[in-house]
Amino acid sequence: MTSRRAPGANAGARVATVPRLVVHVVGAGLWLTGALWLLFHYLLKRQGWLGAVHPLESWWLRFHGAFAFAAIWTFGLLWGTHVVPGWWTRRRFRSGIALVAFVGWLMLSAYLLYYLGDEDQRFVVSVLHWSVGLSCPLLFLAHRWRARAHPPGH
């Protein structure tokens, strides 16, 4: 009986240097702009004529949205070059599935945050969105650490 495998599945799913740099820059930018938006939204509010807001809050959200578009593109790149080949090797499978699930939730919840009209629902989705988003670097680092601890062929 033969198993079905993707072409080149035995080669592993290592991400090349330039795409890896793109993943790191986009991921760091996305996380940093989201964290800065949270900081300015919740902790650095100033009383203004529109209520308690910080003038930079909207800019951090705009930058976060721009990085989110880049992240969607980057995820598409990784899907074909890393996720699918990695699926066949079964290496770091759990952390990889968790990362894909987290990214999927972040994309879905971002869509909901943009289009949900009910403020109570938006608040719940917002808290879940930034909770998952803030934890993503830990999961990413765990996935990377396992890659270094168990290089291909060992």
Where do the language-model regions lie?
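Membrane-embedded alpha-helical bundles that constitute the cytochrome b-like, heme-associated redox core
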Residues: M1-H154
